[in-house]
Curated annotation (Swiss-Prot):
Gene name of this polypeptide: foxa1-a
Residue spans of biased composition, Low complexity class: 287-304
Keywords on record: DNA-binding, Nucleus, Transcription, Transcription regulation
Protein name, per record: Forkhead box protein A1-A
Sequence ranges of Polar residues compositional bias: 325-336
Span of the signal peptide: none
Tissues where this protein is expressed: At neurula stage, expressed in the notochord but not in the neural floor plate. During tailbud stages, expressed in the neural floor plate. At stage 35, expressed in the rhombencephalon, mesencephalon, pharyngeal pouches, foregut and pronephros. At stage 44, expressed in a region of the gut on the right hand side of the embryo. Expressed in the adult lung and liver.
Provenance organism: Xenopus laevis
PANTHER family (UniProt xref): FORKHEAD BOX PROTEIN (PTHR11829), HEPATOCYTE NUCLEAR FACTOR 3-ALPHA (PTHR11829:SF195)
Subcellular location(s) of the protein: Nucleus
Predominant subcellular localization, coarse grouping: nucleus
Biological role: Probable transcription factor.
Lineage summary: Eukaryota, Metazoa, Chordata, Craniata, Vertebrata
Length: 429
């Protein structure tokens, strides 16, 4: 902001030296009346703001622009007393060509203004620059009516901030009998919250699910004195106060009925102690059917299985037979291994107290003897190959199998392996 240039000239000739145009000079205005009022002149478009009317008594500011867009004059009360109705006509710069003129006046001298000075806008303390006078707003227009605009809208049909469990609890607790039917719960929710008057099928399904899958709600049958359709729903007596201080926005804890949990535990216990064969029969139900069909389709394997169920003395000559019994024995062993998990599904009655998935319950005694017999046969083949009696690719029915006489006879007996793999070792319970 440049400094204020003081004007020393008080005569008309002095003013005409500064402005070549005679129309812009104050020729007819007596300068003696404005000696105290005109103290300074600013040659820019801006206007020094006047804080209060008391600042205009001693010295004012005379603002003038070369574009003749606005003219402001600070006048003292003594200078304003001499201004009459012809004051506006005497000032040539304030004609019709000037868009507007802002004059800061003291409140006591406002009554001296004539009707011709209506174009002079009385500016407030926060008024705009007179250079922008064509776009100047009044004090009432500057304060935009923002209070009428509501930024926070009210939604009367907005979704309430309550869960379905909270809505059901509120409906039941506000009922006189502390129990309501499903239709009464629906009606209470729709009467209280307009949001639920639409899309009824969606939230009504959620209400039914909340009633069914929460232990805090108990279904009560209708009494004979209250005929009608549908059962009553009430709160569980042990549920207590699920909502803190009556605030239904959030539950304190999820209620779980201990009786229901105990009943489920007893049922699980009964399932565990119902018998060792029940889980296996439930898992391998289709396997037993496949085993029965395979036994019917292969009748030749069933007599061999019956022979293995016999005594040990009957099994010894069967192992020590010729090459053709050995080949048939191997075929039967392969067939039994293919259906190893399907043959004996029933548990051993002598060890029914064991764990249902123990080895003794999965395998019977005859199956154990059959597996031990097959292990003895495998060991005999390994010993025979270690002695170099024949090639590994030799068929079992070849004459080279005649060297099996060197095998220890006790290794072929099932009692030999029963001493190694006894029942207590196989028991995993």
């Amino acid at each position: 902001m440049l400094g204020i240039v003081k004007m020393e000239g008080h005569e008309t000739t002095d003013w005409s030296n500064y402005y070549q145009d005679t129309q812009e000079a104050y020729s007819s205005v007596p300068v003696s009346n404005m000696t105290q009022g005109l103290a300074s002149m600013n040659t820019y478009m801006t206007m020094n703001p006047m804080s209060s009317s008391s600042n205009m008594t001693a010295a004012g500011s005379f603002n003038m622009s070369y574009g003749n867009s606005g003219l402001g004059a600070g006048l003292s009360p003594s200078g304003m007393s001499g201004m009459g109705a012809g004051a506006a006509s005497a000032m040539n710069g304030m004609g019709s060509g000037v868009p507007s003129m802002g004059t800061a006046l003291s409140p006591s001298n406002m009554n001296a203004m004539s009707a011709q000075q209506a174009s002079m806008n009385s500016l407030s303390y926060s008024s705009m620059n007179p250079g922008m006078s064509p776009m100047a707003y009044g004090s009432s227009n500057m304060n935009r009516a923002r209070d009428t605009k509501t930024f926070r809208r009210s939604y009367p049909h907005a979704k309430p901030p309550y869960s379905y469990i909270s809505l059901i609890t509120m409906a039941i607790q506000q009922a006189p009998s502390k129990m309501l039917t499903l239709s009464e719960i629906y009606q209470w929710i729709m009467d209280l919250f307009p949001y639920y008057r639409q899309n009824q099928q969606r939230w009504q399904n959620s209400i039914r699910h909340s009633l069914s899958f929460n232990d805090c709600f108990v279904k009560v049958a209708r009494s004979p004195d209250k005929p009608g359709k549908g059962s009553y729903w009430t709160l569980h007596p042990d549920s207590g106060n699920m909502f803190e201080n009556g605030c239904y926005l959030r539950r304190q804890k999820r209620f779980k009925c201990e009786k229901t949990q105990g009943g489920k535990g007893n049922q699980d216990g009964r399932k565990d102690h119902s018998g060792p064969s029940s889980p296996l029969q439930r898992v391998h139900g289709k396997s037993s059917q496949m085993d029965s069909s395979s036994s019917m389709s292969n009748p030749s394997s069933s007599p061999q299985a019956l022979e293995h169920n016999g005594s040990n003395g009957e099994m010894k000559p069967q192992v020590a037979a010729g090459p053709s019994p050995l080949s048939s024995h191997q075929n039967h062993s392969t067939h039994s291994l293919a259906h190893e998990s399907h043959i004996h599904l029933k548990g051993d009655p002598h060890y029914s107290f064991n764990h249902p998935f123990s080895i003794n319950n999965l395998m019977s005694s005859s199956e154990q003897q059959h597996k031990l017999d097959f292990k003895a046969y495998e060991q005999a083949l390994q010993q025979y190959s270690s002695y170099g009696g024949g090639l590994p690719g030799m068929p079992l029915g070849s004459p080279s199998m005649s060297g099996r006489g060197n095998i220890e006879p006790s290794a072929l007996e099932p009692t030999y392996y029963q001493g190694v793999y006894s029942r207590p070792v196989l028991n995993t319970s």
